């Protein structure tokens, strides 16, 4: 993941966050679907995770760990 994109999103750049969400949505959705076993519930969980990621992004200390951090949120 592009560390600068993550840093820009942390600074409140909505376009950077939209790019992050687009880049990671599929992977987050697969994780949710594997856990929940239901496509509709996985979609809901992924959408909620994206909202939670936006809210919690300022708390991320190491932008290089964005992907692992975002997976923890979806779980």
Where does each model-flagged region fall?
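Acidic, Ser/Thr- and Pro/Gly-rich low-complexity regulatory segments
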Residues: 1-3
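Short, charged helix-capping/linker segments at alpha-helix termini
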Residues: 10-19, 29-48
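Hydrophobic/aromatic residues within well-ordered alpha-helical segments
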Residues: 20-24, 28, 74
């Amino acid at each position: 993941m592009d560390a600068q994109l993550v840093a820009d999103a942390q600074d409140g750049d909505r376009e950077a966050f939209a790019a992050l969400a687009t880049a990671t949505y599929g992977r987050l959705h697969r994780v949710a679907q594997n856990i929940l076993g239901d496509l509709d519930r996985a979609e809901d969980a992924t959408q909620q995770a994206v909202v939670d990621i936006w809210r919690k992004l300022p708390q991320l200390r190491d932008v290089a760990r964005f992907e692992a951090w975002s997976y923890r949120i979806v779980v």
